[in-house]
Amino acid sequence: MEAIAYSLAFTFLKIVIVFSLALGIGAYLTWFERKLAGHIQNRLGPTVVGKFGILQPLADALKLATKEVIIPRGADKPVYYAAVVMALVPSILLLTIIPFGPGFRVGNTYIEPIIADVNIALLLAFAFGSLSVYGTIFSGWASNSKYAFIGSLRKAAVVIAYEVVLGFSVLGVILLAGTLSTVGIVEAQIQKGVWFIFYQPVAFILYLFCMLAESGRVPFDIQEAEAELVTGYNVEYGGMKFGAFPLAEWYVNVIALSAIAVVLFFGGWDGPHIFGPLSPYFWFVFKTFALVFFTLWLHWTLPRFQAKDITEIAWKILLPIAILNVIITAVVVYAF
């Protein structure tokens, strides 16, 4: 009984730590992205609040917290509020199946730096990723606004198309690793001595497309499309509720999907032991934020696709390539 209570308490502690870090890092990615955008556009970015504008996220949070919240006339209030939760929670839940490093011992206790080490981790990742679109759909429907509704429909169309491509892009990795466990996939790469990016470069490119589409990043941000829909599905939200949507979709989601990409294609925590026992955790964080940086950089360098082109690219180009990649991988795995 004591062992069960201890295990539950320790799991709860890991949940609090991971979720707090995700929200905190996600908030500070807003500052980093604005600095990056300023550098790309030959300006300084945030400079006023704190040295180098480092306290800008705190100022933004204070501003949003003190904003007046105006609910549109005719809005479905229960669904209106539930949409915020449905947008934020699935993005955070994605972090529960990510192994941040190898297990280690502290005294007689074996600690695994993952919240849910289950054999169907990737299946859960797909489930959590699919749930996030409901927050978008609920917000568009409940807001009683044509701009919000059109934005939510666009997001739903993108997710339906790219979830299929995402599933096929990951199938090749599953065939190579022989497991749906994220820990097992990392261990398979370490055992083979080769990261799956070298076996599955096409799958990684497909995954990158899907990651940008799922997180609503340029060139796939047609659900916001400021020139067409103001800010899209969350246009009728104010205060902290308004900030919760980009925090979930643009930042926490990008962190989670980048971390999953590291697990699938870049060997997870595998890397040279240059920092002693901390090396695995360093390499995992380094690889993850290298992908996050790449995603943010693309956002400020690429133009937006037209709405009609995005789903056509998925169904007519990416999906056939993904299916062909799975067939070739299956033949090679079966033959060798």
From Swiss-Prot:
Any Pfam family matching the protein: NADHdh
InterPro entries in the record: NADH_UbQ_OxRdtase_su1/FPO (IPR001694), NADH_UbQ_OxRdtase_su1_CS (IPR018086)
Single Gene Ontology MF annotation: quinone binding
Summary of the function given for this chain in its UniProt record: NDH-1 shuttles electrons from NADH, via FMN and iron-sulfur (Fe-S) centers, to quinones in the respiratory chain. The immediate electron acceptor for the enzyme in this species is believed to be ubiquinone. Couples the redox reaction to proton translocation (for every two electrons transferred, four hydrogen ions are translocated across the cytoplasmic membrane), and thus conserves the redox energy in a proton gradient. This subunit may bind ubiquinone.
Transmembrane segments: 12-32, 84-104, 118-138, 156-176, 193-213, 247-267, 274-294, 313-333
Subcellular location: Cell inner membrane
First-level EC class: translocase
Catalytic reaction list: a quinone + NADH + 5 H(+)(in) = a quinol + NAD(+) + 4 H(+)(out)
Subunit and interaction comment: NDH-1 is composed of 14 different subunits. Subunits NuoA, H, J, K, L, M, N constitute the membrane sector of the complex.
Keywords of the record: Cell inner membrane, Cell membrane, Membrane, NAD, Quinone, Translocase, Transmembrane, Transmembrane helix, Ubiquinone
Keyword Cell inner membrane among UniProt keywords: yes
Location, primary (coarse class): membrane
Family the entry assigns: Belongs to the complex I subunit 1 family.
Name under which the protein is recorded: NADH-quinone oxidoreductase subunit H
